[in-house]
A protein has these predicted regions:
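Short beta-strand segments that buttress and anchor functional surface loops
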Residues: 67-68, 90-97
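Hydrophobic ligand-binding cavity/cleft-lining segments
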Residues: 1-60
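Short coil-to-beta-strand transition motifs
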Residues: 72-78, 99-101
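Beta-strand/loop substructures that line and gate deep hydrophobic ligand-binding cavities in soluble
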Residues: 94-141
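A short, structured loop/turn motif at beta-sheet edges
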Residues: 19-23, 83-87, 108-117
């Protein structure tokens, strides 16, 4: 895991090799959210969705338009699809109530015929001291070992 900042944005980047072709890995991360849920800690996503609803946000109730396909502009729970590069990249922008702005990006590239390199990057642009406190307060949850991912 790499934790860094760039121009006031906190970046948390994780990479791992996955024993699956890139197309299969891309298919998995493009089906996240909605009825499918998330790859680990669904309880934490549910709690975050509940808190978001209490704060007047959209929560997790939106689900998603299609369980298998994403397009730019689609809602995925409390995220909005900001970028899609078929077979390669999915970037989600947070629409939940936050003291800042956040994005979650999944990127995959072939390492060889049967192995892929998966990169997950969380971006957070904190708004003031409350944004920094939010990031570091919830960092232990974000720091869950990526081997818990069910790839």
């Amino acid at each position: 895991m790499v934790l860094a900042t760039h121009e006031g944005i906190i970046l948390e980047r994780r990479q791992r090799l996955v024993r699956s072709p890139a197309a299969a890995v891309y298919g998995v991360f493009c089906r996240l959210g909605g009825e499918t849920g998330w790859l680990c800690m669904n309880w934490a996503w549910a709690v975050r969705g509940f808190v978001d609803r209490v704060l007047g946000g959209v929560g997790l109730r939106r689900g998603r338009r299609d369980p298998h396909e994403v397009r730019v502009g689609d809602a995925v729970d409390f995220w909005r699809v900001e970028a899609v590069e078929p077979g390669r990249l999915l970037r989600l922008r947070a629409e939940m109530k936050l003291p800042g702005r956040a994005w979650l990006e999944f990127r995959v590239e072939s390492a060889d015929a049967d192995t892929s390199r998966l990169t997950q990057t969380a971006f957070f642009a904190p708004r003031g001291l409350s944004g920094l406190l939010y990031w570091y307060l919830f960092y232990p949850i974000h720091a869950v070992n990526p081997t818990a991912w069910r790839w």
